[in-house]
Amino acid sequence: MRYRRGASAERELVKLLESKGFAVLRSAGSHKIDLVAGNGKEYLCIEVKSTRSRKLYLPIEDVEKLVEFAGRFGGRPVLAVKFVNVGWRFYGPNRLEHGEKSYKIDLETPFMTLDGLLGKQRTLEGVL
């Protein structure tokens, strides 16, 4: 069930990014990243997660793989989390705190909206 929810979230995010003018490639399976998106000016390397919980733990090595790939690709690393019944939230890995083994993201963690991520934010949602 988790795989299906995650794949569904990936497809939903693909449609959202395409509606904002991005070309998007989805990498199905357990690879380094889930989505690569670009619009000719900006390139995003995205790890997608979906959870019914109010918090999420990501292994440090998964985030490091994302950052490493994005660096080699010339893109910006992004963690996209869909909190079910809350919505999408976007995080830059360098702005997250982590413990010895994992990063923790919860509903209190400062985040960006999709428009904020793309530099088109018009409200303070997620900023404060």
UniProtKB/Swiss-Prot annotation:
Keywords recorded for this protein, A-Z: DNA damage, DNA recombination, DNA repair, DNA-binding, Endonuclease, Hydrolase, Magnesium, Metal-binding, Nuclease
Oligomeric and partner information: Homodimer.
PANTHER family documented for this protein: HOLLIDAY JUNCTION RESOLVASE HJC
Name listed for the protein in its UniProt record: Crossover junction endodeoxyribonuclease Hjc
Keyword Lipid metabolism: no
HAMAP family per the UniProt record, alphabetical: HJ_Resolv_Hjc
UniProt keyword Disulfide bond present: no
Cofactor remark from the record: Binds 1 Mg(2+) ion per subunit.
Site (Transition state stabilizer): 49
Family, per entry: Belongs to the Holliday junction resolvase Hjc family.
Disulfide bridge partners, by residue number: none
A single GO molecular function term of this UniProt record: DNA binding
Reactions catalysed according to its record: Endonucleolytic cleavage at a junction such as a reciprocal single-stranded crossover between two homologous DNA duplexes (Holliday junction)
Recorded superkingdom: Archaea
